[in-house]
């Protein structure tokens, strides 16, 4: 029963969000995404802060830490990654569906060469709030037994 109520609640929230998104496209916003001196409504704040895939700038060296001999242009790439709040301290926002995307990146080897090559990056397609893994318990399980 709780699951059904939760599902109905989130379905209505999504419907409100999509309805608002339709009207938001019709009314141009200021550079910050909001009309000047306008108060952002609670449902907008709530929906935009909940766990979901959101465009995040990711440093290429974070994804390819062993490629230190290159300089990359651009040095970071826009990727969809899980982010947001779960409204419960025991939950975390994690990806449940992922896929690879290939992008053209300039790879520069200082004083030697530069070329545009393809690099693959992991994108998050769907996210969910799931129970946090207990790090202390996990470390205990990872330790070898004597």
From Swiss-Prot:
Residues that carry a glycan: 100
Xref: SUPFAM superfamilies: Cystine-knot cytokines
One Pfam short name: PDGF
InterPro entries, A to Z: Cystine-knot_cytokine, PD_growth_factor_CS, PDGF/VEGF_dom, PDGF/VEGF_growth_factor
GO molecular function annotation: chemoattractant activity; growth factor activity; heparin binding; vascular endothelial growth factor receptor binding
Disulfide bonds: 51-93, 82-127, 86-129
PROSITE patterns xrefs: PDGF_1 (PS00249), PDGF_2 (PS50278)
Glycoprotein found in the keyword field: yes
Similarity field: Belongs to the PDGF/VEGF growth factor family.
Purpose of the protein: Growth factor active in angiogenesis, vasculogenesis and endothelial cell growth. Induces endothelial cell proliferation, promotes cell migration, inhibits apoptosis and induces permeabilization of blood vessels. Binds to the FLT1/VEGFR1 and KDR/VEGFR2 receptors, heparan sulfate and heparin. Binding to NRP1 receptor initiates a signaling pathway needed for motor neuron axon guidance and cell body migration, including for the caudal migration of facial motor neurons from rhombomere 4 to rhombomere 6 during embryonic development. Also binds the DEAR/FBXW7-AS1 receptor.
UniProt subunit comment: Homodimer; disulfide-linked. Also found as heterodimer with PGF. Interacts with NRP1. Interacts with isoform 2 of BSG. Interacts with CD82; this interaction inhibits VEGFA-mediated signaling pathway.
Protein's UniProt name: Vascular endothelial growth factor A
Species whose genome carries this gene: Ovis aries (Sheep)
